[in-house]
Amino acid sequence: MKLKVYTWIFLLLFSCQSIIAQEPATKVDLSLAKEIDHSIKSGLKWLYDQQEDDGSWNHYPAITALVLSAYLRAHPSVSESEPMIADGFAFLTACIKPNGSIYSEDMPNYNTSICLIAFKDANNPAYDQVIKNAEDYLMGLQIDESTDITTDSLYYGGVGYGGDQRPDLSNLQWAIEAMAVDERKAYDPEKNMSEDEKNRIIGKKLFYDKALVFLARCQNLQNVNPESYSQNDGGFMYEPGSSKAGGTNSYASMTYAGLKSMIYARVDKDDPRVQSAYNWISSNYAIETTPLMGLQGLYYYYQTMAKAMNAFGIESVDSPDGTSHPWRHDLANQLLKMQTAEGFWVNENGRWWENNPVLVTAYTLLALEEIAGLPESTTVKKRNVIFK
């Protein structure tokens, strides 16, 4: 592990200073906000000691990027000027390929998408070209007419892990999030945009429109997905005609991912596709486990849920039986009780790398930061939310 120097981050994490402001503009009560503050601080402390000598976490780009985003979103004074953050970005920069992708050995789309989010969170103009190149790479991965695939293909509009691997909703939702993170800056009507910026906006719009075609084929909603495999409960499956929950069953992680992706792709919240996804969520609301999947991918589920609910902009999920579930309160308390004494989180079920405490702790911190934030902050350039 790296020898640490006494920086602002060190002083913040190892002092009595609070991360969350005394009177936070938060959607949770002050008592819970203080518990979240302590939890985030403990998690960041633990991650502080896990950084490798090469600046990475676990020597892996996507995991490193998730950790960097967790730090950058926790406090506005955390910046790339901090040595540990700079070292992390130096590792990511070393993973940049000539075609704009950001990865080491495998899964170029997955890694590039998550690294792109971190580069945007850095809010550093020095990375503008890195961001543009990564966006161009992701848009180039989309399956469409340029790959001799027509709109009647089940895979049209999708994105997979990269290369020749077939598309799936999980990879597509990361790519959409990576594109959408700084949307508000891009769509500022008062800004005099260059032709390049205008063309980039047009390119993103086309990317979203094609992605929505693929999303429809992952949704169990027959009026938008008339394929024979489609059920009609409004939820989402992993890929057209196949679900990790068996058959073509809708399940929670992908339904939250689908909801989030539609909103990021600028589908109106009153659109039947969005409302049908929410109706599935309201009928299958769960916190302790992920519906139909148990503990498999549980922390992925938590961070996707927090992002989706923030994007959807509601404070309570109303179940068909009339029960109102304050999702921020429910999810925060669940995550708080799952934290270890050392400050990290880990899943006893190791599927999808969730026996890796660095990955799972990064997921959880991002979820807690969403919980503590404002719904409308979801696509802001640098989402420091309430931490001041």
State each model region's role.
Residues 1-5:
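Positively charged n-region of N-terminal signal peptides that target proteins for export
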Residues 6-8, 21, 385-386:
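Short amphipathic alpha-helical "recognition" segments used for binding
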Residues 7-17:
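Bacterial N-terminal signal peptides
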Residues 22-42, 53-84, 98-136, 141-333, ...:
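An alpha-helical repeat/solenoid feature that recognizes helix-turn-helix modules
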Residues 44, 89, 385-387:
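Secreted/extracellular ectodomain signature
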Residues 85-95:
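Active-site-surrounding "flap" and adjacent substrate/cofactor-binding loops of secreted or lumenal enzymes
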